[in-house]
Amino acid sequence: MGGMTIAEKILATHAGKEEVKPGEIVLAKVDFMFGNDVTTPLAIKTFRKIGVEKVFDPERIAIVLDHFTPNKDIKAAEQCKFSREFAREQGIKWFFEGGNVGVEHCLLPELGLVLPGELIIGADSHTCTYGALGAFATGVGSTDLAVAMATGEAWFRVPETIKFVYEGDLQPWVTSKDLILYTIGDIGVNGALYKVMEFSGEVIEKLSVEQRMTMTNMAIEAGAKTGIIEPDKKTIEYVKGRAKREYKIYKSDEDAKYYKVIEYDVSKIEPQVAFPHLPENTVPISKAAKMNIKIDQVVIGSCTNGRLEDLRMAAEVLEGQKVAPWVRLIILPCSPTVYFKAMKEGLLEIFLEAGAVIGPPTCGPCLGGHMGILASGERAVSTTNRNFVGRMGHPKSEVYLASPYVAAASAILGRIASPEEVVK
């Protein structure tokens, strides 16, 4: 038997096999699954069509009403009501709305509902976030979610793995958001199509678990099936006291076969900005800051960069500063816990004094939902993960993706800017 990657080991175990090979199709037991207010209603309708009366296990399913909540209109309210009634009927334990809801990919790891070594599916494309914990986590359609809710299983084609190795010392102001943007800029939005992106190297080891989540979150933006990072002491420390189930640690074998290995010297990487209308359109900040690109709005938040460390970064730049005239700065902590801790640390005070609007935990403007939609001709710098045409509003608006540092600096100067221009 040849060596296997961490992703292959997780799939093999959950499929009840000793080994799997790329290209093989397996039926595997799923540890945890979830949907949101956009994807759950269709899954429920499909579940009804299957004709099963009860979900396979109400403790292994979550419904997180995070996209259009607090309800933005009647349709959103009806979607949430439909999902809520199903959760009550089925006795689904992990149902989140109102004061306990957070952006799903922040909330579920925080609560210990997704764990190392697990096989996780979610009816949301950024489910790959949990790969930061050493899980095989991937987005599925509502139909696959419905079948999994009924059976506890899902089918997978075993993907090949690309190993990314990051070495060297990070420059000032460079974050994991810059690393993943640089990577996508290098390989392209199809560069890891249906592959696993395995992130490794001394730089990844030094990143916090929250920073790692930013990287795995955006694996899908390179076309990947998922992103994954081997668990280490930091991972175990993160899940300690949170874990709702027992879990198992997997690591890639020394002789594991990779589709390819890509190495980066991070000392040459500076903060990145992804220009419209693809995350691969990356430009280093030294160049972007000189282009005098005026902006109308800045959004700091989302499942990519709405965690406590991200808000601390923003506060580091915003403290004692004011948002530029005619610029709207919207900050969305990604969970109630993050919101509460940001308040305790005085971050919210810094944001309010700077002239920011602080909203509740919601996906909101990231997908053009609400709480920060762009008009025709408007430009935004955002810490979110996608900048497709019309992603955050009007088809003739523009979205520039960046880290919390760059986003905060841009809000202050009213144009795409480097934090070095603000923090002396």
Curated annotation (Swiss-Prot):
UniProt remark on cofactor binding: Binds 1 [4Fe-4S] cluster per subunit.
Keyword Amino-acid biosynthesis (UniProt): yes
Pfam families assigned: Aconitase
Residues the entry annotates as binding [4Fe-4S] cluster: C303, C363, C366
Subunit record text: Heterodimer of LeuC and LeuD.
Transmembrane segments: none
Keyword vocabulary terms for this entry: 4Fe-4S, Amino-acid biosynthesis, Branched-chain amino acid biosynthesis, Iron, Iron-sulfur, Leucine biosynthesis, Lyase, Metal-binding
Biological classification of the source: Archaea, Methanobacteriati, Methanobacteriota, Thermococci, Thermococcales
Pathway: Amino-acid biosynthesis; L-leucine biosynthesis; L-leucine from 3-methyl-2-oxobutanoate: step 2/4
Required cofactor(s): [4Fe-4S] cluster
Alphabetical list of NCBIfam families matching this protein: hacA_fam, IPMI_arch, LEU2, PRK00402.1
Molecular-function GO term, any one: metal ion binding
Protein name, as recorded: 3-isopropylmalate dehydratase large subunit 1
Function: Catalyzes the isomerization between 2-isopropylmalate and 3-isopropylmalate, via the formation of 2-isopropylmaleate.
Family: Belongs to the aconitase/IPM isomerase family. LeuC type 2 subfamily.
CDD domains reported for this sequence: IPMI
Top-rank taxon: Archaea
